[in-house]
């Protein structure tokens, strides 16, 4: 047996990789990845120990078609014997996902960490001890900052990320018969030169508004070069150019401090495409990754999705490019996930600049876990965090609780007079309006935007408008369709043609349109101010002629919005100037007070992590920013028809899924069931869902969720 070669992988053409070769390759990568947060030794240990269980005769038979073998528990057991808990957990989950810790008394063989360890301690694993004749495990110490349960759990997930990426990468390099090469992309210095070229046309600025925007941009560039990693706010009024300004800060800091990448986190999928497109124009396609539901390649967590089958997913799963644009859902759910594919990218958040656009949109029921995770990345993983918004939320007390030693700096301090220079609208209140009365008011105006709280209300108001120049926007329209309508809206606004738009809130965040008048259904003050940002956006009309009308609709407010609407009403009733910084601060403070600290962690994520032993799987099951997970239904319309045909033929690729995302609509479970019952859907082999009944989609209002002619099923 001394000359027996224990194998880790075997290709169809007969090439072999020994276990020792794989362990050394994985350990080298894992150590390099973990170096970003000073955990090289932990990475080396996890990499060398993760596949020790493959040193069994049973696993060697598995390579030739034998039954499945638990090869992860052996390495976990050896690391635990060495008192290296983080490495033990990471190894335990490197194929099936991080388990719940459970308790020491768990029955051997149960799915918890202790159940697996107890099985190993009772000698119920296949004999794997041949590894001891080939190498010994390296020594490692757990970083001091990972001493508490909360911080230890976060560190373990980050180490797990390093191990998964290293394991998949080394295996993929062997299976592809090509050495691992980091993603080919430009340096931060080169990206900075491209940014300078992009903004050079803005100088010298013309007009007062552009002068203010350029001043903000220059201040952000200067602050980025001046400050090291930390916690920052960027409070810029709507129209102040905060997207490029925040990017400029991040790039200046990344260049000056040799940071690795910029991650731009956006609340809505509906605006991610346009932001990513701007970044591609600045930096080039090869330097920007757009990551959300429409571009993911779904991969199941079992042996069938081991590294051998992962080439389609590498760039999406690793985030190893300089600029990533993603959604808050993907970002935060990954930070609390337990699956290998979702966690693989996490180590690349270390030494990165994280920009949270529209930070006020962080969902209240998950606010404390979200803020805690940001604080962890800044405190212990060399990241910078920028909370970027035109309506800064009162998050300071929560950050001070979780990161008391880190000051929160405002990147661009705005004196009240400076803020006033961006005032472009006046507000008025209209009380309660029926949908008929509202439509009559809109009909009297040539160009007007109306934003309501639900998709049902948007349809009802839209259908009561008559004549030409009327448009409807909602998330029931696929992105390419919405973009085409927005292009037509902008053209009509520019040419002075009739243009009445009824929309849900999707138009509020970052959509570049400029109306002379806006109606906004009563909502949270942040939403009201976002809607106001679509009125007189370029400052070409006097504020007194640019009216934002706040009204109460005929439907009761959706339960989801009750608290924010209540806080907004308090501010409207008591603050003379609802757009002042004082009113904004009052709103967010009131919003947090109305719910209290417990409502900011409604699913008790942080208490669970403190009281239980590393409950990875339970936390992942609880942490869903969107309470009702949606399913993407693809529309075989326009280019989407050909793309769906490619899916049907099995031609899966990242590019295909990204392009298909432009022809997808997110549908909630109850609506999906209604469409299913009506026979309106087709399910493809890769799990994709396609609308079979094209008659359910109209060019005016998008997807109809009432296929049987019954009551409509709409949500906000």
Question: Residue spans of the language-model regions?
Answer:
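Conserved helicase motor
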Residues: 9-13, 269, 290-304, 453-456, ...
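Accessory nucleic-acid engagement/destabilization modules that flank
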Residues: 1-197
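Conserved Walker A/P-loop ATP-binding site and its immediately adjacent core
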Residues: 259-283, 292-295, 394
């Amino acid at each position: 047996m001394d000359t027996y070669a224990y194998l880790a992988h075997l290709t169809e053409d007969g090439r072999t990789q020994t276990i020792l070769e794989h362990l050394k390759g994985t350990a080298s990568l894992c150590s390099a990845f973990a170096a970003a947060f000073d955990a090289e030794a932990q990475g080396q240990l996890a990499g060398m120990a993760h596949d020790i269980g493959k040193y069994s005769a049973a696993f060697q038979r598995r390579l030739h078609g034998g039954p499945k073998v638990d090869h992860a528990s052996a390495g976990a057991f050896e690391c635990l014997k060495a008192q290296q808990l983080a490495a033990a957990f990471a190894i335990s989950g490197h194929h099936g996902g991080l388990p719940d810790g459970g308790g020491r008394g768990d029955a051997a063989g149960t799915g918890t960490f202790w159940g697996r360890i107890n099985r190993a301690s009772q000698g119920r694993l296949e004999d794997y001890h041949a590894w001891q004749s080939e190498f010994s495990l390296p020594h490692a110490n757990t970083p001091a900052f990972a001493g508490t349960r909360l911080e230890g759990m976060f560190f373990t997930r980050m180490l797990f990320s390093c191990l998964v990426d290293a394991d998949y990468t080394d295996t993929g390099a062997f299976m592809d018969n090509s050495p691992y090469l980091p993603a080919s992309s430009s340096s931060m210095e080169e990206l900075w030169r491209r940014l300078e070229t992009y903004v050079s046309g803005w100088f010298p600025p013309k007009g007062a508004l552009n002068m203010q925007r350029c001043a903000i941009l220059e201040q952000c560039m200067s602050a980025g070069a001046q400050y090291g990693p930390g916690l920052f706010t960027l409070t810029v009024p709507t129209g102040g150019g905060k997207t490029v300004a925040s990017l400029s800060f991040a790039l200046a800091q990344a260049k000056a401090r040799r940071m690795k990448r910029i991650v731009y986190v956006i609340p809505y999928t509906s605006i991610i495409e346009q932001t990513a497109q701007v970044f591609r124009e600045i930096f080039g396609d090869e330097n920007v990754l757009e990551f959300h539901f429409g571009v993911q390649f779904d991969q199941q967590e079992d042996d069938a999705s081991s590294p051998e089958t992962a080439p389609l997913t590498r760039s999406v799963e690793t985030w190893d490019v300089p600029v990533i644009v993603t959604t808050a859902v993907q970002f935060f759910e990954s930070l609390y996930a337990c699956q290998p594919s979702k966690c693989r990218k996490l180590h690349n958040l270390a030494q990165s600049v994280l920009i949270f656009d529209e930070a006020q949109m962080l969902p209240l029921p998950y606010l404390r876990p979200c803020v805690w995770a940001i604080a962890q990345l800044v405190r212990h993983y060399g990241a910078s965090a920028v909370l970027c918004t035109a309506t800064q939320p009162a998050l300071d007390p929560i950050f001070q609780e979780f990161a008391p030693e880190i000051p929160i700096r405002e990147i661009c301090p705005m004196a009240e007079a400076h803020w006033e220079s961006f005032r472009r609208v006046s507000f008025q209140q209209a009380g309660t309006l029926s949908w008929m009365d509202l439509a009559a008011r809109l009909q009297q105006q040539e160009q007007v935007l109306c934003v309501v709280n639900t998709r049902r209300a948007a349809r009802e108001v839209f259908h009561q408008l008559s004549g030409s120049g009327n448009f409807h926007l909602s998330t029931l329209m696929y992105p390419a369709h919405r973009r085409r309508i927005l292009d037509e809206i902008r053209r009509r606004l520019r040419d002075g043609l009739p243009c009445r738009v009824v929309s849900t809130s999707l138009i509020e965040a970052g959509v570049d349109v400029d109306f002379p008048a806006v109606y906004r259904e009563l909502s949270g003050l942040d939403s009201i101010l976002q809607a106001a940002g679509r009125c007189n956006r370029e400052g070409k009309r006097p504020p007194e002629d640019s009216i934002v009308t706040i009204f109460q609709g005929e439907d009761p407010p959706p339960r989801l919005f009750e608290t924010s609407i209540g806080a907004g009403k308090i501010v409207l009733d008591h603050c003379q100037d609802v757009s002042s910084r004082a009113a904004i601060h009052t709103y967010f403070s009131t919003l947090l007070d109305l719910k209290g600290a417990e409502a900011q962690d409604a699913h008790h994520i942080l208490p669970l992590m403190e009281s239980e032993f590393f409950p990875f799987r339970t936390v992942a099951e609880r942490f869903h920013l969107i309470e009702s997970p949606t399913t993407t239904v693809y529309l075989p319309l326009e280019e989407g028809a050909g793309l769906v045909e490619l899916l049907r033929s099995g031609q899966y690729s990242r590019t295909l899924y990204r392009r298909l995302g432009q022809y997808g609509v997110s549908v909630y479970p109850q609506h999906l069931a209604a469409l299913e019952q009506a026979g309106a859907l087709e399910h493809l082999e890769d799990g994709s869902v396609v609308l079979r009944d094209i008659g359910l989609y109209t060019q005016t209002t998008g997807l109809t969720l009432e296929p049987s002619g019954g009551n409509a099923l709409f949500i906000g």
